[in-house]
Amino acid sequence: MKISRVALASLVIINILACSDSKTDKTYNKIVLTNKDDTLLNRASVEKTILGFLNWYKNNEDKLGQINLIKGGLPEKTTNYSFDFVATRKYLFELKRSGYLSDSFINNLQKHFIEVDDYLKKYPQNDGPIQGLDYDIIMKSQDYMDVWSNLDNVKILNKDINNDKAYLKLEFGGYYKANYYLTKKDSLWLLDNIVNDFSGEK
């Protein structure tokens, strides 16, 4: 039985990652983060999981940015862009060990890397922004500084929890909105996906 390249890569990354190993006030829509530690308590609720991850990513964004996912391009213009999949494994490992992200989040990111790499092989380039990497691949946006400056000013615009699945729509500082999808595993909530909302609707 043939296994697709994406499916095979997903199985590989799962094996690699497996081997390596606030509170909400009574107004309901105002979140207060009590601490930034990666503890079981901080990941025991949907809100704390989201804010815990955002704080973690804010504090580790520069470190993750030092992992060069792309080879080629400037200053060697004769070498086309291509993915460094050794670097991507390290990048995904660092994300996974944050303790906030589900296997689904990690696997979808890995699939995205493969799709971008396939695009670069079909349409070679050695300069300029790369389609699919011309925004922050975690925050799913180019401009998300309003999130960092408003982690203590967050409102819940929509919330739906059904057994082990959850969805929250959050607003940061009265402007930036994003949707968060989570799954509960072993009594802890993990992020499956982040989708920005530019509709302007509440």
Protein language model regions, located:
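Positively charged n-region of N-terminal signal peptides that target proteins for export
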Residues: 1-5
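Sec-dependent N-terminal signal peptides
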Residues: 6-14
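Residues embedded in well-ordered secondary-structure elements
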Residues: 8, 157-159, 171
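C-terminal motif of bacterial Sec signal peptides marking the signal peptidase cleavage site
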Residues: 17-18
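Flexible low-complexity loop/turn motifs enriched in small/helix-breaking residues
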Residues: 23-161
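Short, hydrophobic/aromatic-rich segments at coil-to-beta transitions
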Residues: 162-168
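Short beta-strand edge/turn micro-motifs at domain boundaries
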Residues: 167, 177-202
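Glycine-centered tight beta-turn/hairpin loop motif at sheet-sheet or coil-to-beta transitions
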Residues: 173-175
